[in-house]
Amino acid sequence: MPDMKPVQDIHAHHLGKWAENQALNILQANGFKLVIRNFHSRVGEIDLIVAKADELIFVEVKARTLGSYAAANEVLLVSQQRKIIKTAQYFLNRYPDYQQFYCRFDVICFDFPHKIAKTVQQDFSKLRYDQQWIENAFTL
């Protein structure tokens, strides 16, 4: 029997990918270039790493719908921040050319104020949502 994922997991995956694409579009519209997407270390993952001039931004992307226990900008726990910081340090050690860049941690959030049908493949951009870009959301 094939490994079947629950509908809500598939839905969350599609919403997450949509949010990452939207966040990247916003960043690129502001002059940032993608360095790497979904960078992994053994402790965590960073959704987007972008650069402009001598500035390097590690971006966490969050998307939430009505029924989630908190708004997107409220769900980044201190433990998650530590994992992102450690992963950023790993990135800088692996790619030393970026060590002289000014680095910061941003969060881009998407909140949908209503439930989204989980059984339908959605074009999330057609739905109403609030978007927030939190620069310097946390520091080392």
From Swiss-Prot:
Segments passing through the bilayer: none
GO MF annotation: an example: nucleic acid binding
Pfam families: UPF0102 (PF02021)
Top-rank lineage group of the source organism: Bacteria
SUPFAM superfamilies the record matches: Restriction endonuclease-like
Family: Belongs to the UPF0102 family.
Protein name: UPF0102 protein ACIAD1132
